[in-house]
Amino acid sequence: MIDFPIKYRLIKKEKYTGARLGEIITPHGTFPTPMFMPVGTQATVKTQSPEELQQMGSGIILANTYHLWLRPGDELIAKAGGLHKFMNWDQAILTDSGGFQVYSLAEKRDISEEGVTFKNHLNGSKMFLSPEKAISVQNNLGSDIMMSFDECPQFYQPYDYVKKSIERTSRWAERGLKAHRRPHDQGLFGIVQGAGFEDLRRQSSHDLVSMDFPGYSIGGLAVGETHEEMNAVLDFTVPLLPENKPRYLMGVGAPDSLIDGVIRGVDMYDCVLPTRIARNGTCMTSNGRLVVKNAAYAEDFSPIDPECDCYTCKNYTRAYVRHLLKADETFGIRLTSYHNLYFLVNLMAKVRQAIVDDNLLEFRQDFIEKYGYNASNRNF
């Protein structure tokens, strides 16, 4: 049996759902699951220091392979001693494969069996990313958890296109495994694709599980499908994945989607949502989203969320944070970003406790009622 550098330990299953409490052991420490991972696109979580992330309970963060490959370059980061030393973060790091950014950011993509040729979005130069190159870059970055190179087809692509795509992604996964130079200290995850097609998700899962990765990611969701469609895909995909390995739902950060993913047995999540909306003054609170820049809060001297015990809510008022944002002061974005990240990391801590108490469905109902989900804030 292979001794993987990434190990999943199941602690408890929730009595009434597929939720599971566990922990993931990595070369840079152990973190509890289910866990939300803050995204540090450019080797930094926007406006936050590593110490602040540790204080809020983030045992793992995500960094983007595509961005770091282009700037400052994976070889420079390797010279610095790897990503952990480069950014002074001593806990776990997960890197994506770069594939999603190639499809979403780069211009003039050309996908072939060999890989993807594209135009660099920074300077317009022609570049090529293959399964082997994606692994090589991540080996240089030195992340604890790496991703296989995959194609992320749009959710509503035609069946025939998605079928060809997942079959190529499986071949790319095999090539990536062969190219992996550091299997002893970096765990490589396979990414299950298949859009909304159950048989294609089954085919993709079967292919990847047969390759015996140390963990599995569910890709191709949170790309425009409805909340109900996402849940349906999870309902038929998660049971196809091994129980003794981590399950990671990529790119998901809306609070109800996190809880619904946990109910279906998912362990890990990431999303830029909390920091992206924070820059526009939108805050997640126990009673739903709050746009603190609105004039209604100009003389509101209460915390952003009276039920939150984060640094922002313990020390500053809505009126002050609004003033900072209106004055274009960076500190305002730091405060809203910290609050939103804390909100999701803390939400996962509450979810873990609900699993311990076997009352996750009750917790979900209470949360959804208070958060006030409706058509206008479904994605927040």
Swiss-Prot record:
Q: What is the lineage of its organism?
A: Bacteria, Bacillati, Bacillota, Bacilli, Lactobacillales
Gene Ontology molecular-function annotations = metal ion binding; tRNA-guanosine(34) queuine transglycosylase activity
HAMAP family from the entry? Q_tRNA_Tgt
What is the primary gene name for this protein? tgt
Q: Does the keyword Ribosomal protein apply?
A: no
Could you say which cofactors this protein requires? Answer: Zn(2+)
Cofactor binding remark? Binds 1 zinc ion per subunit.
The protein, known as: Queuine tRNA-ribosyltransferase
Q: Which organism is it from?
A: Streptococcus thermophilus (strain ATCC BAA-250 / LMG 18311)
Q: Which positions in this protein are listed as binding Zn(2+)?
A: 308, 310, 313, 339
Q: Quaternary structure? A: Homodimer. Within each dimer, one monomer is responsible for RNA recognition and catalysis, while the other monomer binds to the replacement base PreQ1.
Q: Where is the active site?
A: 96 (proton acceptor), 270 (nucleophile)
Q: Where does substrate bind?
A: 96-100, 150, 193, 220
Q: Briefly, what is this protein's role?
A: Catalyzes the base-exchange of a guanine (G) residue with the queuine precursor 7-aminomethyl-7-deazaguanine (PreQ1) at position 34 (anticodon wobble position) in tRNAs with GU(N) anticodons (tRNA-Asp, -Asn, -His and -Tyr). Catalysis occurs through a double-displacement mechanism. The nucleophile active site attacks the C1' of nucleotide 34 to detach the guanine base from the RNA, forming a covalent enzyme-RNA intermediate. The proton acceptor active site deprotonates the incoming PreQ1, allowing a nucleophilic attack on the C1' of the ribose to form the product.
Tell me which UniProt keywords the record has, alphabetically. Answer: Glycosyltransferase, Metal-binding, Queuosine biosynthesis, Transferase, tRNA processing, Zinc
